[in-house]
Amino acid sequence: MIETYSQTAPRSVATGPPVSMKIFMYLLTVFLITQMIGSALFAVYLHRRLDKIEDERNLYEDFVFMKTLQKCNKGEGSLSLLNCEEIKSQFEAFLKEIMLNNEMKKEENIAMQKGDQDPRIAAHVISEASSNPASVLRWAPKGYYTISSNLVSLENGKQLAVKRQGLYYVYAQVTFCSNRAASSQAPFVASLCLHSPSGTERVLLRAASSRGSSKPCGQQSIHLGGVFELHPGASVFVNVTDPSQVSHGTGFTSFGLLKL
């Protein structure tokens, strides 16, 4: 007896897409990307070209307008008087608009320059004689009185007050009779003082000079000056130990400040 055996066929192995299909997909992808980039570049070029054409058209219209205006001035061409007057009025309105814009720009530049620059703040005053002299010297509101800005003022005839913070050069010159008989032989002392917005006072500068013994008046001068930071509402004044010895002649005793 003959026995037969049947063998099962082997399973077929799944294979991927052929190489030609892969190459086709790759080329298709490259083509699509290239087309997108080309379309974008063409759109940019077209946009710029349209802008250029628009500018050229505007220039051509301006050229035609100027030629027409020139013909109107010369009386050439077939334009009526009414059309020429209308063209001239348009041109005049255009010129007025340009001039107005230029004036506005100039005013804006001037305003910006003024805003960038700090206003000049300065003051110079001379002493004023008083029947009842006090240790804090008084200053004349007239004569050599100089105030260059409303940001500084003379208060109560004694103090120079500032309204803007900054560095100030403050100075004073006090002339006195060194040989005149005085209540004491103590040195003559002049002080430059600060009155702060909080109400406190302090000495900024101080100088002293000795007296002579002879009776005739021998004039001497004390000079004070320095740079200080002053705040809005602060004021400075001059104090002396013997106000009866101060000379109030023109140019002898003065006081002032200057914002740096």
From Swiss-Prot:
Similarity-based family: Belongs to the tumor necrosis factor family.
Function: Cytokine that acts as a ligand to CD40/TNFRSF5. Costimulates T-cell proliferation and cytokine production. Its cross-linking on T-cells generates a costimulatory signal which enhances the production of IL4 and IL10 in conjunction with the TCR/CD3 ligation and CD28 costimulation. Induces the activation of NF-kappa-B. Induces the activation of kinases MAPK8 and PAK2 in T-cells. Mediates B-cell proliferation in the absence of co-stimulus as well as IgE production in the presence of IL4. Involved in immunoglobulin class switching.
Species in which this protein is naturally found: Canis lupus familiaris
Domain THD, chain residue ranges per copy: 121-260
Name this polypeptide is given: CD40 ligand
Disulfide bonds: 177-217
UniProt-listed PROSITE patterns: THD_1, THD_2
Localization terms from the record: Cell membrane; Cell surface
Lineage, uppermost ranks: Eukaryota, Metazoa, Chordata, Craniata, Vertebrata
Site (Cleavage): 111-112
Residues exposed to the Cytoplasmic side: 1-22
